[in-house]
């Protein structure tokens, strides 16, 4: 049975998969994002940035599997992602400080931005790569305008420092999101529609992933 390996330490991505009936093997990737972004050059468009980062993360995890977890690498699909928010001509990752998160929120309030999530997928069989692909999903996010006191309370929670763009849809930040256009799970960090398409192209079905990663319909009925 095919294992799904999530190459990310993101609690949001893990929850998306668990809620969708997948209990993945989690192996966090360790990629120097600044080096990858610098290599792309200043003219790289947002979709390329997140796509290349996701592909690099998936490749790093796949290399780890074929070197140290060959039983898993005998039949698995590696999924790694990278998310960034594009708004007002800027591409934003995780804020480095509370002050940076505050500045981001002041620029986002009452506006719309695009949440880009790159998805890197690698299929391993018999410890060899038989398929690899990387694509980007885009969701438009409409931000509300939190009051000064609400914004400070949100910043004090620390949540904004853990996520791209300094906000969440499924956490405390959801209070300040007026709506989304596109797939909501993409905003959390992993687009289920895009992932379904990518795994189908490498010869897998959702049912096969349920069967190989305890948590699907049959498991939940027990």
UniProtKB/Swiss-Prot annotation:
- The answer to keyword Hydrolase applying to this record is yes
Localization of this protein: Cytoplasm
GO terms for MF? nucleoside triphosphate diphosphatase activity
Q: Quote the catalytic residue positions.
A: 82
| Catalytic function, reaction form | a ribonucleoside 5'-triphosphate + H2O = a ribonucleoside 5'-phosphate + diphosphate + H(+); a 2'-deoxyribonucleoside 5'-triphosphate + H2O = a 2'-deoxyribonucleoside 5'-phosphate + diphosphate + H(+)
Annotated GO CC locations: cytoplasm
Extract the InterPro entries matched here.
Answer: ITPase-like_fam, Maf-like
- What's the cofactor? a divalent metal cation
The reply to whether Hydrolase figures as a keyword in the UniProt entry is yes
Name the enzyme group at the top EC level: hydrolase
Name the UniProt key words of this record, in alphabetical order.
Cytoplasm, Hydrolase, Nucleotide metabolism
EC numbers: 3.6.1.9
GO biological process terms, alphabetically, are: nucleotide metabolic process
Gene3D superfamilies per the UniProt record, alphabetical = 3.90.950.10
PANTHER family in the cross-refs: BIFUNCTIONAL DTTP/UTP PYROPHOSPHATASE/METHYLTRANSFERASE PROTEIN-RELATED, BIFUNCTIONAL DTTP_UTP PYROPHOSPHATASE_METHYLTRANSFERASE PROTEIN-RELATED
* Main function: Nucleoside triphosphate pyrophosphatase. May have a dual role in cell division arrest and in preventing the incorporation of modified nucleotides into cellular nucleic acids.
HAMAP family (alphabetical): Maf
- What does the sequence similarity comment in the record state about its family? Belongs to the Maf family.
Q: What is this protein called?
A: Nucleoside triphosphate pyrophosphatase
- Which source organism? Mycobacterium bovis (strain ATCC BAA-935 / AF2122/97)
């Amino acid at each position: 049975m095919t294992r799904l390996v999530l190459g990310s330490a993101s609690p949001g991505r893990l929850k998306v998969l668990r809620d969708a009936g997948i209990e993945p093997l989690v192996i966090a990737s360790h990629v120097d994002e600044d080096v990858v972004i610098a290599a792309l050059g200043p003219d790289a468009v947002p979709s390329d940035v997140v796509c290349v980062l996701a592909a690099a993360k998936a490749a790093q995890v796949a290399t780890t599997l074929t070197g140290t977890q060959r039983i898993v690498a005998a039949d698995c699909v590696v999924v790694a992602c990278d998310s960034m928010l594009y708004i007002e001509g800027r591409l934003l990752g995780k804020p480095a400080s509370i002050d940076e998160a505050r500045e981001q929120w002041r620029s986002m309030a009452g506006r719309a931005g695009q949440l880009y999530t790159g998805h890197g997928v690698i299929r391993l069989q018999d410890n060899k790569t038989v398929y690899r692909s990387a694509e980007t999903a885009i969701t438009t996010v409409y931000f509300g305008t939190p009051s000064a006191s609400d914004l400070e309370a949100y910043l004090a929670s620390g949540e904004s420092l853990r996520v791209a763009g300094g906000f969440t849809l499924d956490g405390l930040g959801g209070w300040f999101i007026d709506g989304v256009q596109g797939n909501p799970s993409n905003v959390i960090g992993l687009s289920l529609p895009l992932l379904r398409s990518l795994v189908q192209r490498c010869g897998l079905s959702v049912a096969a992933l349920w069967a190989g990663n305890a948590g699907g319909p049959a498991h939940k009925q027990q």
